[in-house]
């Protein structure tokens, strides 16, 4: 092995090799730990340049505490300790309809959930005592899962059938009277009958979102607000009642729950034995629908309880089966001020239903401004041939004089919107000649 001094003589004599320094890394082999000693870099020669640097570093002390920032909402007390945020000493809550809840709980309470939202029955109705009459409180209600299982109805009882679905976003129902004073809450029971349960994850109405076939437990929270504009609360108390546990369903599974709901719910009278929605009535309605509509006998048009006009949806049968009435004479038509039965004739309705939109079908006879001699070779006027709906016996289809028989007014005006009934001596047309 050659020494560097022998390989590079032009660089001059080098520094002699020395033993490893005490601070050298001992992990290297001894042959590689030998280094060169550089006397030009001794510390004694650099003291004039490094006089301000201390040999041993000192640990920095803790910074002084920062001054308190001014509050944006005025003077505010310091937040209470964490243990005080979850306690309201002396406050108690009792379930008003506890006996009803126990009756349902003995069978297994079920609550219907729908996409639109369904109210709970029984509803949570509580009474509170021990509140400060002058302080303000908020009443909240939420529903949380009891366990991590999914249930199914197995003949006579509920049993777990697998793992629960992922928990949905938690929602809280705020009582509409919140915030209110303690005297207001203690004056009467607090009812949460407006709470609605839904299974729609995209519900925009704020209803409580639940999974079907899961067991839930309602919780009631009482929150005291020391200052309405403050971000700190004076205390929170949560209450839960074991008898209010229920299973959410989209249709009742237990027949006994169905009977209990019908018997106890005042809004389910129609589903009782004597109600319109009882099983006997529902089966009868289904049979009637399968048989089809039954014909209803219609009474005479002059009766007092029957509406006058075939457009009434309460009438049955075909209007063409009725006997047509004879055409009135010109004297009777001129003296008549209103059509019989309060509406136009059935023949006019067959031509166009707009005749029954409230327009009169009998108009006074038109008197021409000046007499005209009849022309035997001239065809009958268009108006007489078109307006004649019911020619009398022995008369031809064409007449030389205008007819005064009943007609539908929409034929004259050319649209289904009737003109107002003309006054005495009035006319429907603005000209002085007959229409051709």
From Swiss-Prot:
InterPro entries: p53-like_TF_DNA-bd_sf, T-box_DNA-bd, T-box_sf, TF_Brachyury, TF_T-box, TF_T-box_CS. Transmembrane segments: none annotated. One of its GO terms (biological process) is cell fate specification. Pfam families: T-box (PF00907). Residues 100-273 bind DNA. Gene3D superfamilies: Transcription factor, T-box. It comes from the Eukaryota. Residues 275-284 have a biased composition (Basic and acidic residues). Residues 67-87, 275-344, 360-383 are annotated as: Disordered. Its main location: nucleus. Keywords: Developmental protein, DNA-binding, Nucleus, Transcription, Transcription regulation. GO terms for molecular function: DNA-binding transcription factor activity, RNA polymerase II-specific; RNA polymerase II cis-regulatory region sequence-specific DNA binding; RNA polymerase II-specific DNA-binding transcription factor binding; sequence-specific double-stranded DNA binding. GO terms for cellular component: chromatin; nucleus. Residues 332-344 have a biased composition (Low complexity). T-box transcription factor that plays an essential role in the determination of the fate of axial stem cells: neural vs mesodermal. Acts in part by down-regulating, a specific enhancer (N1) of SOX2, to inhibit neural development. Seems to also play an essential role in left/right axis determination and acts through effects on Notch signaling around the node as well as through an effect on the morphology and motility of the nodal cilia. This is T-box transcription factor TBX6. It comes from Rattus norvegicus (Rat). The gene is Tbx6.
